[in-house]
Amino acid sequence: TPQPVQPAPTPQGPLEPQPVQPPPAVPAPGQPLVPQQQQTGVPDPNATLAGKGTDTSDVAEVTLSPKPVLVLSGQTSWDQGFQKLSDSFKALRAEAQRAGLAVAGRPLTLFVETTDEGFRFDAMLPVAIPPGGQAPTVGADFRMSTSPAGAALRFLHQAPYDDIDSTYETITAYLEAKNIVVKDAFLEEYVSDLADPGDPNLEINVYVQPK
């Protein structure tokens, strides 16, 4: 049986004017400006950049909003790539905890450069910036930045990480068929944790951005 709607509580006295929030403070010189967290309340550590896909055969046109991210750059061989990324995310989470930053989304990897031997990457962890928008102080190996933003195509990988090459072959074929030219750097978002490269239920969003 539907419950009756409760009336809004009656104020016990005259409403007090709310203080005006000061503008965000400017970060110290050399620190990149990071967008202030738009959401209120507790940050969601499982939030994705543009929702979740449900079918690996679907290609979604999405718009990525910039998020403050804690970044750890690195490079690795293809054979060691999965373990290197997994270790990078553990390091990012530990640094976020040390710096008092709440995790505000699923981890990301921006593949900056790829070769036959391996790749250079920026591992990213979305975080909530404390009120005031000041750039937090982080360790020497880390930096604050923003996640890629703008129009993108989202492809869904639901299979072991060992099989991700097949997803990229599908992406390449789709882009060629549609005559879409994209930026060289592509972005992976790990809806599932990178624990086992053979996990058949691993879920990854792959974003490519048209030029």
Task: Annotate the PLM regions.
Residues T1-K211:
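A solvent-exposed interaction/effector surface
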